[in-house]
């Protein structure tokens, strides 16, 4: 276990199971049937899709992130059928960030928390001035207006469109190009979306 994982675990050491939050979860599955203990309520039918961090270390294991918003974005889905069968799927968002991490590199970039080991001064300057465009979106998901388009978001301008059925990545959208009328978008956009529609 590396130092960054040790540091993250100290924060929640009193909470049983908290350490698992900081472990890489690189397996992707599609429609795996879950074992249900007990009985689900009859009204519980539908699909729940969320996202969050799924990988903390670079593919070659040389560096790791230390903040929840920096972990590599991974979608998860629970699909509850009318007959009570529950299926689970999970898939990483296929972004430039993901491609670089999968190829063994952690791209020098501005992050929410420090990386372990820390960037050297040249890497830090490179990250601040010319680092790759941040397209990792592990914070939230939402639907664009009343369309059938869904995106994963973070506080950076890039939103990653995905198929809510297959969890496949459809591509990148910039906040300024979305059909959310009357909004000024820039790097400080908020990933916690509010709506006045139910």
Model-derived regions, located:
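Beta-propeller domains
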Residues: 1-198
């Amino acid at each position: 276990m590396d130092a960054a994982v040790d540091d993250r675990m100290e924060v929640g050491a009193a909470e049983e199971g908290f350490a698992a939050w900081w472990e890489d979860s690189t397996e992707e599955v599609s429609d795996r049937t879950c074992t249900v203990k007990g009985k689900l309520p009859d009204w519980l039918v539908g699909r729940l899709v969320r996202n969050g961090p799924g990988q903390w270390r670079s593919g070659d294991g040389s560096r790791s992130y230390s903040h929840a918003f920096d972990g590599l974005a991974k979608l998860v889905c629970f699909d509850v059928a009318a007959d009570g069968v529950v299926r689970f799927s999970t898939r990483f968002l296929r972004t430039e960030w993901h491609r670089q991490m999968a190829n063994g590199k952690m791209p020098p970039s501005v992050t929410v928390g420090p990386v372990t080991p820390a960037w050297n001064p040249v890497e830090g300057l490179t990250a601040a001035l010319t680092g790759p465009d941040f397209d990792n979106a592990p914070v939230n998901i939402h639907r664009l207006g009343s369309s059938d388009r869904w995106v994963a978001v973070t506080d950076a301008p890039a939103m990653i469109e995905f198929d809510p059925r297959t969890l496949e990545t459809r591509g990148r959208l910039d906040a300024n190009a979305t059909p959310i009328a009357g909004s000024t978008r820039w790097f400080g956009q908020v990933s916690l979306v509010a709506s006045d529609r139910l």
